[in-house]
Amino acid sequence: MRVVILGSGVVGVTSAWYLSQAGHDVTVIDREPGPALETSAANAGQISPGYAAPWAAPGVPLKAIKWMFQRHAPLAVRLDGTQFQLKWMWQMLRNCDTSHYMENKGRMVRLAEYSRDCLKELRAATGIEYEGRQGGTLQLFRTEQQFENATRDIAVLEDAGVPYQLLESNRLAEVEPALAAVAHKLTGGLRLPNDETGDCQLFTQRLAQMAEQAGVKFRFNTPVDKLLFEGEQIYGVKCGDEVIKADAYVMAFGSYSTAMLKGIVDIPVYPLKGYSLTIPVANEDGAPVSTILDETYKIAITRFDNRIRVGGMAEIVGFNTELLQPRRETLEMVVRDLYPRGGHIEQATFWTGLRPMTPDGTPVVGRTSFKNLWLNTGHGTLGWTMACGSGQLLSDILSGRTPAIPYDDLSVARYSSGFSPARPRHLHGVHN
């Protein structure tokens, strides 16, 4: 089958890889000159299935009000003048109760755990290298309340069979030695030993090279004007004066998917602006070993080979990509506070990207009401974590194979009234 994929970020390229491996004739189209040059370029670097959780959580509405008056707030909102933004925020608020949070987190963890398994298999099969580490991740708590709240997330981890360790502050240095000097500032941490890290852009670029060698065609520097359709079927992609045709079409345009699908399929994917710093390592003993997540500021600090990636925050501000100095100051503040000797902060590279977010936090993966249109978008801050699993899942569905995990509650149909997904089975695993 001829398949056209729109988008060459990590989700688009993994989709291309798995579809090609399934025997399809795949073409990837992107406006950029190469893969992973937008949202996948400089994310936080975490592959953290256990921390997969929606921003829509109990207490967030009240916290959002408090954050409006804080200098280093993890979430900021600025109206962009569109009804879509208001509708999206209302939908997000409706998902902030405990019941929705547990449901959404459960399916996010399910896909993320599966995705990590797919990444392991891909790494074993291809030998792909991307400055990856398999040292686990550590969520850091600064208050007793945060430590107590971790029990809520642990219930979801146990249900999914995800290994974890709940550590008091005096044990944090066992997994991240440099934290010994700042342990007095912390109340503890939640460690997920099976989580990983890696450079998402490097992974995507190298997988794109492998995919091209396997026969995937990449059409870079090719802006897409619109999808052409008749009835309930897509019959082409209009790119300037050219119409590119295929048997099936996959939308993986991230935050730009919503506008491209206007009048075809209604999806609630909105850009969630985030920032990162990439810092050269200055002191091996003072740098992170793997990756940590600061629960207070929602900022991740991740170790690559000779670099430290500091990423996080969320701004609901539309398609604004301005680099704001106060956001850089927040990233610098957190990394100086936890790893004061770790990196040459004065040499850091500052970056921003637009994460494609759904109001319930779960991506949109699978078929649509159109016979030959498929979606793989809306992964929010977890595109790197969920990419391989989403790509394999999409390939299985499109190819008519039975996927390894339940998937009906990942489709766009879940936003329809009366939708009732099948209950997912437990994932294998143990906890301690």
Curated annotation (Swiss-Prot):
Q: What does the record give as the reaction this protein catalyses?
A: a D-alpha-amino acid + A + H2O = a 2-oxocarboxylate + AH2 + NH4(+)
The EC number(s) attached to this protein equal 1.4.99.-
Keywords (alphabetical) are: FAD, Flavoprotein, Oxidoreductase
Pathway assigned to this chain's UniProt record: Amino-acid degradation; D-alanine degradation; NH(3) and pyruvate from D-alanine: step 1/1
- Example GO biological process term? D-alanine catabolic process
Q: Which InterPro entries match?
A: DadA, FAD-dep_OxRdtase, FAD/NAD-bd_sf
Q: Does the keyword Protein biosynthesis apply?
A: no
Q: Name one GO cellular component term.
A: cytoplasm
> Which NCBIfam families does UniProt cross-reference here?
PRK00711.1 (NF001933)
Q: What is this protein called?
A: D-amino acid dehydrogenase
Q: What is the lineage of its organism?
A: Bacteria, Pseudomonadati, Pseudomonadota, Gammaproteobacteria, Enterobacterales
Annotated gene: dadA
